[in-house]
Structure formats: structure tokens, C-alpha cells
């Protein structure tokens, strides 16, 4: 059904492959809605969202209202007469007045296998919890938070060293593929829409800066997952000699019974830190005010010895 008239709502990189796929397959994209521009950096330079940049590149009109609860904004949206509204990480809640506009409703691409991992950080939580499988869900939006009927799920296996960044990229492409399939057969998918099992629902919350500080009393497996969860942003960190040190890659190894946070081994290529259970061999770090680097490079410029301690602030 390439003749479907679509309004697309999205903001970050995750949404871009879907917008590109809809354009490539000839869907009629009447308009793109994205979050208002932000000022970034010391110079307060205006920064466009990735979705806005892609829409402008494709020649699609872009609207950036502060709210969707204004009657004039809703009327302007309704004037596009969309058959369906696609919502992918837009960043705003759609009121009922908007949900009721399109013939086929509002479709969302969510970065988990719902009803598991509803909320703001499904991709991060899949990595943090050590999931072997993740995926995307195409659902019909309702007034709840990720509670709508499911149209399609698509699964993917996680690599043992999967990071939030790598899974984000994979799921953004998988989501685009699943979305275009649903839109091509939308009436069939909506006839077979499946309500979510509320008894299986779990929720995620945004991961804050406090979560990013490594607690060496935790198990090595838990810390290693946290490191991958916070890659590429904001990065898990610890403190060495009063300076912040981000840890980007580590392997779980046997511990030595030392106090958590104690460095128990140092080689030319890496160093090993005792945790609450087991230890972590640190492979990649980022010293304060410097770029990411292999631990071998970091060790060339510092005298690190067994018995030194990594701390919390």
C-alpha cells in the first residue's frame, strides 16, 4: 500500500532508517514532526535533530511544535489528512485528539519485544540485563505508555559483547524493515492485532549519571554489562588518584580475594581490578579530558601498580 499518506514523527538517529525506508519505498510522506531545535555548545549554535536533517535532505516539510495539545497544532496536523501517523522516539506524548486523526491509527516502533521493557530505555536495559535476544515491536499507540496492541515483532540475537550503541544501530534497521512490511499489509496486520499481556509487562527508566559510576562491590558480570550498557553514552566511570577514568571495555576474569576496587594485576596491555565477585581485566579506557584509548596506551603514561585502588567520588 505505497499510496498510504503518512505523517512521520521522530527525533533521534534511531528514527532515521525508518524515514529513509518509507521514502525509498514510495510512501507519500506529507510531513515530518520533530522536536524543536536546540542550542548546543559554548557558541549556542542551533542544532537540528537527525530526523529533521534527513527530512530536509529528502525534501519533506518539517514541523516542530512545542506541544501537540494546542488546538491549532492539532488542526494543522489533521489538515494533512494522514492515513497513518508513524511515531518513533518522537519525545512527546500524543493526546487522544491526535491519536484519533488517522484512518489506521498511530503506529509506533519500540526497541524491545513488548510487553517487556516498556518506557524510555529498552535498548539499554536489554544489554544491562544480559538478554540473549532482543528486537522491535510495531504497535498501535493508545493513551498508555507502550501499552497498545501489537501488530508485529521482529527478533535479533545479541552478541556476547553487545553494546547499547551496536544494538541501537541493529534495531533501528530492523525496525525500518518491520515497519515497511506492516504498512504494505496494514489492514491484515490490524485485523490480527494482539493485545499485550499486562502480567508480563516490565518498565525501564532513563539511566542517570549516578548509575554511570562504577560500584566495585558489585559482581564483575554486573559491572561488565553496565560498561556495555553505557557505551556510547554517557560511559561508565571510576576514580583514580582523584581523576575521573571512564571504562569502555573489560573482560570478566577470576578475582584474587582483595578489597573491591583494588588493582590486582598490571601488564603492558591491561590491568585487572577486583570486584565484589570476580575481577575485571580492563581493555579500553578514557582518562579525564582525553579520547578513548586502549589500556596499553594509557599505561604508557602512568605508573600503575598492584595495590592501587579505584574509588567512588
Predicted regions and their residues:
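N-terminal glycine-/serine-/threonine-rich beta1-alpha1-beta2 phosphate-ribose binding loop
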Residues: 39-81
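An anion-binding loop in the catalytic cleft
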Residues: 217-313
Amino acid at each position: 500500500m505505497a499510496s498510504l499518506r503518512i505523517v512521520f514523527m521522530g527525533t533521534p538517529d534511531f528514527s532515521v532508517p525508518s524515514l529513509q525506508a518509507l521514502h525509498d519505498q514510495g510512501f507519500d510522506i506529507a510531513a515530518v514532526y520533530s522536536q524543536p531545535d536546540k542550542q548546543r555548545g559554548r557558541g549556542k549554535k542551533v542544532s537540528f535533530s537527525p530526523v529533521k536533517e534527513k527530512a530536509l535532505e529528502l525534501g519533506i516539510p518539517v514541523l516542530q511544535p512545542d506541544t501537540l495539545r494546542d488546538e491549532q497544532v492539532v488542526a494543522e496536523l489533521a489538515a494533512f489528512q494522514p492515513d497513518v501517523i508513524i511515531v518513533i522516539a518522537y519525545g512527546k506524548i500524543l493526546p487522544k485528539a491526535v491519536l484519533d486523526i488517522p484512518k489506521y491509527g498511530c503506529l509506533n516502533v519500540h526497541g524491545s519485544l513488548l510487553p517487556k521493557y516498556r518506557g524510555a530505555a529498552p535498548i539499554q536495559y536489554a544489554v544491562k540485563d544480559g538478554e540473549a535476544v532482543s528486537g522491535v515491536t510495531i504497535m498501535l499507540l493508545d493513551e498508555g505508555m507502550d501499552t497498545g496492541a501489537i501488530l508485529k515483532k521482529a527478533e535479533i540475537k545479541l552478541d556476547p559483547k553487545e553494546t547499547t550503541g551496536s544494538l541501537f544501530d541493529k534495531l533501528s534497521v530492523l525496525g525500518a524493515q518491520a515497519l515497511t512490511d506492516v504498512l504494505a499489509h496494514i489492514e491484515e496486520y490490524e485485523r490480527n492485532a494482539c493485545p499485550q499481556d499486562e502480567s508480563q509487562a516490565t518498565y525501564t527508566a532513563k539511566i542517570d549519571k549516578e548509575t554511570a559510576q562504577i560500584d566495585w562491590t558489585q559482581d564483575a558480570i554486573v559491572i561488565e554489562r553496565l560498561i556495555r550498557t553505557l557505551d556510547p553514552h554517557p560511559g561508565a566511570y571510576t576514580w583514580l588518584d582523584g581523576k575521573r577514568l571512564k571504562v569502555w571495555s573489560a573482560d570478566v576474569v577470576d578475582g584474587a580475594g582483595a578489597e573491591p576496587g583494588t588493582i590486582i594485576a598490571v601488564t603492558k596491555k591491561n590491568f585487572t581490578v577486583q570486584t565484589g565477585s570476580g575481577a575485571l581485566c580492563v581493555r579500553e579506557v578514557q582518562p579525564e579530558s582525553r579520547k578513548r584509548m586502549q589500556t596499553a596506551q594509557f599505561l604508557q603514561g602512568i605508573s600503575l601498580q598492584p595495590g592501587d585502588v579505584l574509588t567512588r567520588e
